[in-house]
Amino acid sequence: MAKVNTQCSQPSPRQLSVKDAADRDLDQVENGLGRSHSPCEETSSTVHQGIVMETGELAGAAQSLFTSQGPARVSRFIISIRAWAARHLHHEDPTPDSFLDRFHGAELKEVSSQERNAQPNPGGQEPPEGGKGRKKDPIVVDPSSNIYYRWLTAIALPVFYNWCLLVCRACFDELQSEHLTLWLVLDYSADALYVVDMLVRARTGFLEQGLMVRDTKRLWKHYTKTLHFKLDILSLIPTDLAYLKLGMNYPELRFNRLLRFSRLFEFFDRTETRTNYPNVFRIGNLVLYTLIIIHWNACIYFAISKFIGFGTDSWVYPNTSKPEYGRLSRKYIYSLYWSTLTLTTIGETPPPVKDEEYLFVVIDFLVGVLIFATIVGNVGSMISNMNASRAEFQAKIDSIKQYMQFRKVTKDLETRVIRWFDYLWANRKTVDEKEVLKNLPDKLKAEIAINVHLDTLKKVRIFQDCEAGLLVELVLKLRPAVFSPGDYICKKGDIGREMYIIKEGKLAVVADDGVTQFVVLSDGSYFGEISILNIKGSKSGNRRTANIRSIGYSDLFCLSKDDLMETLTEYPDAKRALEEKGRQILMKDNLIDDDLVTARADARNIEEKVEYLESSLDGLQTRFARLLAEYSASQMKLKQRLSQLESQMTRRGHGFSPDRENSEDASKAD
């Protein structure tokens, strides 16, 4: 039993929240009995009881309590059980990752149809306790869920069973009669699964405007309108009731069960999208279809031979009265052999004699040609798809080899290049991520990049506590880089244009001689983040301060300075925060020159003033040009108005001129 401190101490908030109602009930019971306990004693007793039950000694504690005197002990025992249940039956949500929360918003919760149609309670009344009167959400199967796929696997088995064994039992009488009980059990078990499958289909949701429909009435209406519903109904017609009249040796009465073939095809389609080896699955699927066709053709050949008569000619199955041809295994294997030779057209079979035999062989030849063409075409395309990446990679190697031979590259360098390509192929690093993800929307690209690079990005100090949008942009701009043994990632004094994050491999910080190692960097380390920020006052500027060399093959992530600055233009606050973090890191390492900061600040002030004057001058020039344009427009309008006035005055002056008046006076005098 756990040891408990018996001194009066303050219990935890969780214990207090559980004990609030319990203490009140206990006080009422104890006050009614005239007994008193201090709060410390009550708390100690309750904690003691809880620990007793947590350690698995609930039975012993219960026995000791019920054998004691007084209802108060019984009430404390019940209250302790209530407290223990509240602690252990309460499921706490896992602590979320704050880093992930910045990429994902609040999770949208799909509202059920009952909640959408629910009306608020009048007067704000609470619903009855225990959830009475509240409808439960209907069970709806999501077609993209794992449960639905598992059910497809389960229903595909009886469909495949019917397609393989019904025709075989119908053609080979011994197979049906010798194992009748087994077939009855399997048949009606398959029928039961067919019935359950109809119920599952009636509760399988579908998408409408991007949302899953969960209304059972709409689901049933949608299902009944499909062709699958009609085929499912036909596949469940109890045609085997004719057994009662014809006997049990007619399994062909159950051929309507073959109409459920769509479930088998759906299972194959979903498996092809889920498997990591789709090409292998396609080849296996094609072989399975071919075997089923050969199997059916063999059974039909034996049935035709039985109809014509065994041994009546050279084409049909030999006489079954002979012991070697009377066995069931020989009958099926002989028929399967004949069917394989006929459909594949690779062997000689006895020629047909009767017309119906000729007709059947002609149909078999046509089907065989189609099967052969299908197999050759599909297998050829599958093999080419399987080797497409290898062929493309080999073409790159061949072009590199030809170039190195043309440029007369040294053998040592040529060997290093070939080994680098071999390493890429052996470790499956030849995939072009941009080419693979180019068809995805930006949101899914970001999600994939976050899942791939999240652990790596979380380790970089300057990128911690950045806003989510900036981190998404940076994650999308990370580029993989692979270095060979002995390659220099950076050298002392080089201008820093990238920062690197080690995903896999080991890098050594070496001296100028390239041999002496100061420190070894391993997975998760990063370097070069300060040089791409252009921290003002840095003694090293944006140049590298160390020589870093790859010990073996190293897989790194690279973030270029141009990509970072392009991203930070949209996030000025984040840019200032990153520069401040970088400055603090440099100050800790005593790599900040205050005089240089002041000088650069003065230079920056002068530059800002010059930029301000230039912008002001540009503004003045723009305003002057606008005013000049307005002045020119007003002058044009004024000239047009003056011209109009002159023309009007000219017309009026011409109408009342002095010459006209003198002529009128002369005419009057005459």
Swiss-Prot record:
Compartments, as annotated in UniProt: Cell membrane
PROSITE patterns: CNMP_BINDING_1, CNMP_BINDING_2, CNMP_BINDING_3
Residue span of region C-linker: 388-464
GO-annotated cellular components: axon initial segment; cone photoreceptor outer segment; dendrite; glial cell projection; intracellular cyclic nucleotide activated cation channel complex; neuronal cell body; perikaryon; photoreceptor outer segment
SMART domains noted in UniProt: cNMP
Extracellular side: 175-184, 250-254, 305-327
Binding site for 3',5'-cyclic GMP: 528, 531, 544-545
Protein name: Cyclic nucleotide-gated channel alpha-3
Gene name for this UniProt entry: Cnga3
